[in-house]
């Protein structure tokens, strides 16, 4: 599809920032996760702008926005909170990207959805209805200020029965619903297998769409002791043993998977990357972080750190092996922030 307004190519410049988890998971919020506020505080947008960033990805849980017993019935009072986030972004010069981290019938994290987005008609109807609603709601906002990212990390997670072909079918249905309401909206699609591989079934992408990459490689470093707290041995080093250049390791083990998308000119953005802060030594984390940022600079990719607040972020992380700076009553990892600022251009 050719661009049809002056804003259509605004996404072709790079965006750098953070994932904001304000409405990320209703279950976690109800269980006391302090990263999930049930809304998006304006101060986060203000701070990002003060630091020089221009992008916020909002991974959402659909359960905030529809009635529990009727997925087709939106909850206006909750949608207003999303309106506020979009307004915060526009006010502070932060591009907002809306993403469904949990969609009707799919999430890569527990709890399991009662039906499958890829196999059952009801979740697909609810999913496309949500995107149609948001496309109508935000029609007219320039692509430089707002974009959509369809579904977080499609993957062969049991029991949903997802395949690349099945995901492509769902993505096309959602894209059609969006374009019917707002033909010029820029739309991203996450890569297959948790954002690790291009979905070639969706290629070639048109000028109003692109693919979102997620980098948590090597997983044994970024998620050290996350899934197995009793994992023996120290955190693996970075760069890996036998490798003197971490960027080259990432090129061989991560970027090469994306060569088909790079070669066909697809717009790519690193929508998630990060490292769990609890057990990974700070020096290891900073070395890994800088190499991922160098990789992105080499390829001209924008990026969004997972996340701003909490276990993967730079505010109020649970680590105990670094000096924190007091920042408006929060613990700020200044060294990590300085690295991010260094590589945001």
Label the predicted regions.
Residues 1-57, 91, 260:
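N-terminal carbohydrate-binding accessory modules
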Residues 3-8, 12-14, 110, 118-247, ...:
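Active-site region of glycoside hydrolase catalytic domains
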Residues 20-40, 68-73, 116-119, 220-250, ...:
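Acidic/histidine-rich helix-loop elements
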Residues 21, 59-62, 100-106, 191-193, ...:
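Short, solvent-exposed turn/loop segments enriched in Gly/Ser/Thr/Pro and often Arg
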Residues 26-34, 62-79, 104-122, 156-159, ...:
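Surface-exposed, active-site-proximal loop segments in enzymatic domains
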Residues 34-39, 64-66, 72-76, 155-158, ...:
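Acidic-and-aromatic substrate-binding clefts and catalytic sites of carbohydrate-active enzymes
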Residues 36-56, 71-102, 106-147, 170-181:
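An active-site-proximal structural segment forming one wall of the substrate-binding cleft
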Residues 281-345:
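Aromatic-rich peripheral "rim/lid" segments of glycoside hydrolase catalytic domains that contact
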